[in-house]
């Protein structure tokens, strides 16, 4: 590869990464305009919020739902690989970021917040802080980059481990969250409420 080819490739990748950063910034601005709180109303930021049905859940840097966002990264890497195989990795990341950011905006809309509160165990859920939502997107990116480098089998094993572990500890995970959001099962809601 010539020096000119390398320079072109670096500039091309830089374009895609700047576009990725722009999506994250747009997500943050949109959530601010939606009236989301920047950080936890408690006034401080924690690295980890271990409570599930607490006022601090979905308000700090990470929580029990962080593994779900890492799994999003695994899944979105796979999707990008399938439909954008010939595009640079950063272009596939842009697709993943657009999906994740779109989900974060939808998740923090009154429609989905109300749905969570009526159909799932998240009775006191009032939406994510902007910081938590942005970090959810960053964790998705970490999952994406992990999936891009790790063997598929390892990525699948880690996803299964995350699902089983969080399901056991907090009685919720990505699979249950999606199920309860789309097609609530009363028996699961009762089981989750027993935590």
Curated annotation (Swiss-Prot):
Q: What kind of membrane protein is this, topologically?
A: Multi-pass membrane protein
> Where in the sequence is the signal peptide annotated?
none
Top-level taxon of origin: Bacteria
On whether Cell membrane is a keyword of this UniProt record, the answer is yes
Tell me what organism the protein belongs to: Rhizobium etli (strain ATCC 51251 / DSM 11541 / JCM 21823 / NBRC 15573 / CFN 42)
Q: Fetch the Pfam families from UniProt.
A: DUF2585
Q: Which UniProt keywords apply?
A: Cell membrane, Membrane, Transmembrane, Transmembrane helix
Protein's UniProt name? UPF0314 protein RHE_CH03951
A GO cellular component annotated for this chain's UniProt record is: plasma membrane
According to its UniProt record, which protein family does this protein belong to? Belongs to the UPF0314 family.
| Keyword Transmembrane applies | yes
**Membrane-spanning ranges:** 14-34, 64-84, 128-148, 150-170
What the entry lists under InterPro entries is as follows: DUF2585 (IPR019691)
Location relative to the cell = Cell membrane
């Amino acid at each position: 590869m010539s020096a000119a080819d390398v320079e072109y490739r670096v500039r091309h990748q830089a374009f895609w990464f700047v576009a990725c950063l722009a999506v994250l910034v747009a997500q943050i601005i949109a959530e601010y305009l939606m009236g989301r709180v920047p950080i936890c109303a408690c006034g401080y930021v924690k690295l980890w919020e271990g409570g599930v049905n607490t006022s601090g859940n979905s308000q700090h840097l990470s929580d029990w739902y962080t593994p779900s966002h890492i799994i999003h990264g695994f899944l979105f890497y796979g999707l990008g690989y399938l439909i954008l195989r010939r595009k640079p990795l950063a272009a596939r990341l842009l697709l993943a970021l657009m999906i994740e950011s779109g989900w974060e905006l939808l998740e923090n809309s009154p429609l989905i917040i109300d749905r969570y509160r009526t159909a799932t165990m998240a009775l006191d859920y009032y939406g994510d802080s902007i910081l938590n939502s942005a970090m959810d997107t960053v964790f998705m990116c970490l999952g994406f980059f992990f999936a891009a480098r790790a063997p598929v089998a390892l990525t699948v094993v880690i996803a299964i481990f995350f699902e089983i572990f969080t399901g056991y500890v907090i009685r919720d995970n990505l699979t249950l969250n999606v199920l309860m959001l789309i097609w609530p099962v009363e028996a699961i809601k009762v089981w989750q409420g027993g935590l």
